């Protein structure tokens, strides 16, 4: 069975984030980034955020993803935007990063921690703390459970064909605090499959492309299932964006 994020990527969606561009912009506006800033993006996918970072700040980004199959598309995106000199693209495992301690000023990781087990989440966040410089910042963006609901989590996992483990607000805060971070959070309505969110994230033409592809006969079942689930549970699931600062 095809994973939901891979399905949406195949439909033409470029922003595979629960809170879309709104949440990403809040994260980026919460930290000072200059051309000297060293950034690690974990789970970069096709590099949409990496491209935005370089174009906006002219900084260097190391972009990694565990899925080696997506990296050629990442490199194509980087080349198409003529920013190869700013970006290093590598395969990498969030729970076992290959970089020395205190290597980066910023780590950004969107829409990935939700898909990890509790143990894997803890391992990844500890790795982020390790590779961040003192005073560095971790920027994350995930799915928020507004209340504990095991059946809802199971239904979400079935809908997107991925075993996921979103947390409550208290759960997310505890995860980052346990690794020594001081987290600040923002949450709101998910935009991933919301019509207005699709337009905000992809533009009118991009949103139409996603919908048109999703309604092709071979795609209709999964597209409709995901669209219905996320809109039916708009009051049960939010996005959560977290700015977590490592003490100096």
Give the ranges of each region predicted by the language model.
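Class I SAM-dependent methyltransferase Rossmann-like catalytic core
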Residues: 4-19
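Short, glycine-/aromatic-enriched active-site segment of Class I SAM-dependent methyltransferases
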Residues: 11, 143-163
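Conserved alpha-helix/loop element of class I SAM-dependent methyltransferases that forms part
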Residues: 17-37
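Class I SAM-dependent methyltransferase SAM/SAH-binding core
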Residues: 40, 46-96
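A short acidic, Gly/Pro-enriched loop at the edge of an enzyme's catalytic core
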Residues: 95-107
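A short glycine-rich, Lys/Arg-flanked "PGG" loop and its adjoining helix->strand segment in the class I
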Residues: 122-137
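Short alpha-helix
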Residues: 164-180
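Conserved Class I S-adenosyl-L-methionine
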Residues: 185-248
